[in-house]
Amino acid sequence: YNQAAEVAFRDFLRNKYHNNIKELNDAWGTAFWSEVYSSFDEITLPKTAQMFMNHHQILDYRRFAARQTNDFLNEQCLLIKKYAHNQWVTTNYIPNYDEGHIGGSPDLDFVSYTRYMVYGDNEGIGRRGYRVGNPLRIAFANDFFRPVQGTYGVMELQPGQVNWGSIN
């Protein structure tokens, strides 16, 4: 992370917790492991090298990252619409179901996603899984994206077995 990201995360937290560090400490349960903060300036972005990370901090970080992603998508969308008045605008999401930013960009005309059936795991269906993948992935993705905005699209799809499946 860079300094601007840390400052933006702290600003996000100040706004969320009404510029009240005690409110943040209470919400994060920092007294339990002697992690009490006396200032928002002491807070850093979660680092994977940390031995133990506060789960509440990670959750707030994910919310912050989702907001940053959506702000960026909305900014791009509005810029495109400024110059291309009759153009639909979408983005190519990947169905990572634990990502919080999906559906958070109201300026997009509709959401779309990419789904590749074969990408290196077989999910317990044997050698065939490495060749053709799991067909349920497309069903899960459709069920996930359908309620986001109603209209959705599949931007990219691997339609079948890759002709070099025995190699990769």
Pin down the residues of each PLM region.
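Polysaccharide-binding and catalytic clefts of secreted carbohydrate-active enzymes
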Residues: Y1-A141
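Aromatic/acidic polysaccharide-binding cleft in carbohydrate-active enzymes
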Residues: T114-R127, Y152-N168
